[in-house]
Amino acid sequence: ISADGSRYEGNLRGGKQHGKGNLRRADGYTYNGDWVNGVKEGIGKITMSDGGTYEGEWQAGTIVGQGVAIHASGERYEGGFRNGKRHGKGVLATPAGYEYKGDWVDGQATGQAVIKDVDGAVYEGSVINGARSGVGKLVHPEGFTLEGTWANGQLNGTGKIISANGDTYEGDLVEGRREGSGTSTTSAGDTYSGQYLNDQRHGTGTFKGADGYAYEGLWAEGSAAGAGTVTYPDGSIQTSTFVDNLAEGPGKITYPDGSTYEGDWSAGVIEGQGRAT
């Protein structure tokens, strides 16, 4: 029994703990395991005053090697350690249902991993400091999939989104939003290929409907806006300026039989001055 109230029971050599032994401190901390010249070395288990435990390998008094740590909160980690920190391969599981299985560096979840979130989503790929960063794929139980380059937990760079209804997007993303150049395809067969801004069609792009309708031109905030050309399912071709998807102002339409109208439009309807041939 030491002056500080600690109590040791076990083998000694030269007045030092050596071999198998149990140390119990006044604050409730205990260690039961191997000792070498007064230092924890080999296999041992500690129990903290709050009930948390670690059982596994020790080197020179420090947690190094393989072991299992269970925190008072119920959080459980099994895997590699270095200098008392998670390091190498390991699995972390929380009572809430979160699970991380993969690489650790000096206590940080960094490297390649499979993460199961509490909502059932599963991510497989690169992780930096616990956040999705690098190349990876997320599959959500609601049916959608996110795949590509990640930064700080969001798709950032080139990626692919597959919605639960079968709609897809493949192209540039910024913080999870479609932004830059990309191609969207609906489950019905409609496609849009062009520029995006803040998750909306914006800039130059081409829409092709499964019914044969097509628009090529300028877009703003998700709608045809500016100079563009429409090809209708019957083969008619209209060139005009568009506002909120409707022709507005001067334009020209050529019908399948070769006849034309060139003149003014208002809210998608021929109205004003014009000439038909």
Predicted region positions:
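N-terminal compositionally biased, intrinsically disordered segments and leader/signal-like regions
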Residues: 3, 95, 111, 185-187, ...
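Solvent-exposed, well-ordered amphipathic alpha-helical segments
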Residues: 20-25, 48, 71, 140, ...
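Conserved anchor residues at repeat-unit boundaries in beta-strand-based tandem repeats, strongest
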Residues: 7-18, 30-41, 53-64, 76-87, ...
